[in-house]
């Protein structure tokens, strides 16, 4: 009964997390209903499918932060992150150099070499449960896409 986001404490732990990305995503998808699994195709639109499932399953952020839900939270965060990364061309990273950093110990992804653009999928999943719009993940994706395209166009 944790009620807190689980943070990573080492780069080795992060590298292990990355190395198991495909297996963890496969295990997460296998736990979902078949009709939903078929709709999670890695597209930006599938973020809405995932968000609808999250909203139906979890009435509050605290509900997904329970220890027994850790694999669902991790799986959902991985799925969201991989959709962003694959569609927008980003890279995963972990920052452990500043404990006051907002995403300290939380895997994040970034997209631009010359302008830092961090997004962390785990807080995106929990914020979608707080906002409860059913459109939050896709809205953030589209905003990130616009920002990235604009910045890439300005880079030499």
Give the role of each language-model region.
Residues 67-125:
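Amphipathic protein-protein interaction modules
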Residues 54-57, 83, 87-88, 128-132:
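Generic structural signal for hydrophobic core residues of well-folded globular domains
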Residues 22-26, 36, 61, 87, ...:
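Amphipathic alpha-helical interaction segments
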